[in-house]
Amino acid sequence: MFSKKYRLSYLPLFYEDLDEKVTYIVEKLKNPKAANDLLDKVESAIMERLPLAESFEPYHSVRERRYSYYRIYVDNYIIYYVVIDDDPNDLIMEVRRFLYNGQNRGNMV
């Protein structure tokens, strides 16, 4: 069976989103263990998805996009990523956003 290989890439915006959520959990909720657990879950979910990046339903956006967005659910959060396939020999899973599930995502994704 043919298996695609994806290279992993992150946008700075993803790190900003993640830092914002982790900082909130640590500083406002006073729960560093929960923040650390969330980081572990996020890393694990991304690494598990990497070999199968295009095997899930794309996110249906009202805007036309060059690359389809995909989602990974982690607790009450959603990781958004795209697969950049401009070069079939260099497929990139680019992780773009980390948003709270209750956030208005209309103009964020």
Q: Which residues does each PLM region occupy?
A:
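A short, surface-exposed loop/turn module that caps and links secondary-structure elements
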Residues: S44-Y73
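Enriched for short, Lys/Arg-rich terminal
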Residues: Y70-V109
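Conserved short aromatic-hydrophobic micro-motifs
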Residues: V42, R49-L50, Y81, V95
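Inter-domain helical "communication" segments and dimerization helices
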Residues: F2, P58, D86-N89
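Arg/Lys-rich, positively charged N-terminal/basic patches that mediate binding to nucleic acids
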Residues: M1-E43
